[in-house]
């Protein structure tokens, strides 16, 4: 990985953290520590290693992101929005009734598998 790629990933991780904290703050509910702690890993997966396609989210050969730390899902939601899988404004609906984005990963969002 080049220095430029490393800097770009650090910037993505910072953006994930900002968006996760913003989502949790707006929802007035959640655990920011979990999302903050997985931001570097999530950024590396979604923006460097994983083969995914927002134009074809059910692509058979796509990589899967396994998140076993449920409280950290705001970081994953932010990554999905930043990659173009969900509209950015959907992040403002975290934990609201009827939202596909809940405090733990749930199948209301078609990209989440449990």
Regions found by a protein language model. Give the residues of each.
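N-terminal glycine-rich anion-binding loops that anchor highly charged ligand groups
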Residues: 15-16, 33, 37
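Cofactor-binding active-site loop characterized by glycine-rich and histidine/acidic residues
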Residues: 9, 20-23, 36-112
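N-terminal capping segment at the start of a domain
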Residues: 13-29
